[in-house]
Curated annotation (Swiss-Prot):
Enzyme Commission number(s) from the entry: 2.7.1.2
HAMAP family: Glucokinase
Any one GO cellular component localisation term in the record: cytosol
Record InterPro entries: ATPase_NBD, Bacterial_glucokinase, Glucokinase
Name of this chain's protein: Glucokinase
Highest taxon, organism lineage: Bacteria
């Protein structure tokens, strides 16, 4: 019978590596510490009833390599051996996975722990710097990812290792500051009467913000898809869309600056995910860094902290692979999150 295990021993190779999102799941297999990961086509979560079926048909049926262990990054709380995912119907059951897929050892981590692991060693070709600050590259870092929601993860450097710190930073309060904010915020969709950062800084939040602008300006909204809003904004073809993305960048800068102070992230703040990559031209305009640095009495500190957009297409898998190769370099907690045959 598989059972929870708190061992910090390295996962045995070959290792199945998975990044499980709400819409897509991405998988690779790492055969040893020196090999490049073998990548598999993305799996649509809606196409399979369970994650076990997706792994079997999307990975194991397509290779002769049988993984001995697995490390999976999931969006959702990891409290026991039945782990429901936040944005899809799958439930991760490590014990069932061990019994049914021939895997000996399963470790499950938070999706933004994986993103944090990735930013420990991103090369310049996999990140785009915003602003002039360079920071301290062996200091703590933080990663924010506006996507389906707003993920936040810290990466603390201590005792010669990188320690990922998961959390729910995307649900901090986000309040109005400017005159325009006070016009718009009464029209932002709330959760139990509060506006959290995630109510604006994600895909649906972009639509919330666009709709609020349309209401205040007395115009008919014509777009319901975040991709349409960003496309029109970057093309300059719709005034409301342009303001939406500009304010999105401002609010993201405010929250990113807050997180930089929380983690004392002298090593940098990293923006991950498809939205950050798509609106990179807007983030490079002054509004983002101005909002990021506007943190009196600590403006001087924020000016020294670099900000980046992660451009690596598979950052979470890269982070998990780094951990799988050299676990001694990372302080990843396995308590209550690792199961062995």
């Amino acid at each position: 019978m598989p059972k929870p295990n708190h061992s910090t021993a390295p996962l045995p190779f070959p290792i199945l590596i998975g990044d499980i999102g709400g819409t897509n799941a991405r998988f690779s297999i790492l055969t040893d510490a020196y090999a490049e990961p073998k990548q598999f086509p993305n799996v649509r979560t809606a196409d399979f009833a369970t994650i076990d079926e997706a792994i079997q048909k999307g990975v194991l049926d397509k290779t002769a390599v049988q993984p001995r262990s697995a490390i999976l990054a999931v969006a959702g709380p990891i409290n026991d051996d039945e782990i429901p995912l936040t944005n899809c119907d799958w439930v991760v059951r490590p014990k069932t996975m061990i019994e049914g897929l021939g895997i000996e050892d399963v470790l499950v981590v938070n999706d933004f722990e994986a993103q944090a692991l990735a930013v420990a060693a991103l090369s310049d070709e996999n990140r785009e710097r915003i602003g002039d600050a360079t920071g301290d590259m062996i200091a703590s870092r933080v990663v924010l990812g506006p996507g389906t929601g707003l993920g936040v993860g810290g990466l603390v450097h201590a005792q010669h290792s990188w320690i990922p710190v998961p959390g729910e930073g995307g649900h901090v309060d986000l309040g109005p500051r400017s005159k325009r904010d006070y016009q718009l915020f009464p029209h932002i969709e709330t959760i139990e009467s509060r506006v959290s950062a995630e109510q604006i800084l994600c895909g649906r939040g972009l639509v919330n913000l666009y709709n609020a602008i349309c209401i205040v300006d007395g115009i008919q909204p014509t777009m319901k898809d975040p991709a349409d809003i960003t496309s029109h904004a970057l093309a300059g073809s719709d005034k409301a869309a342009v303001e939406t993305v500009s304010l999105f960048a401002t609010y993201l800068g405010r929250v990113a600056g807050d997180m930089a102070m929380v983690f004392m992230a002298r090593g940098g703040v990293y923006l991950s995910g498809g939205i950050s990559q798509k609106i990179l031209p807007a983030l490079k305009k002054p509004e983002f860094r101005m909002a990021f640095e506007d943190k009196a009495p600590h403006t001087a500190l924020l000016r020294t902290i670099p900000t980046y957009v992660v451009t690596h297409p598979l950052a979470a898998l890269a982070g998990l692979s780094s951990y799988a190769r050299m676990p001694a370099n990372f302080g990843v907690s396995t308590e209550g999150r690792r199961w062995r045959r």
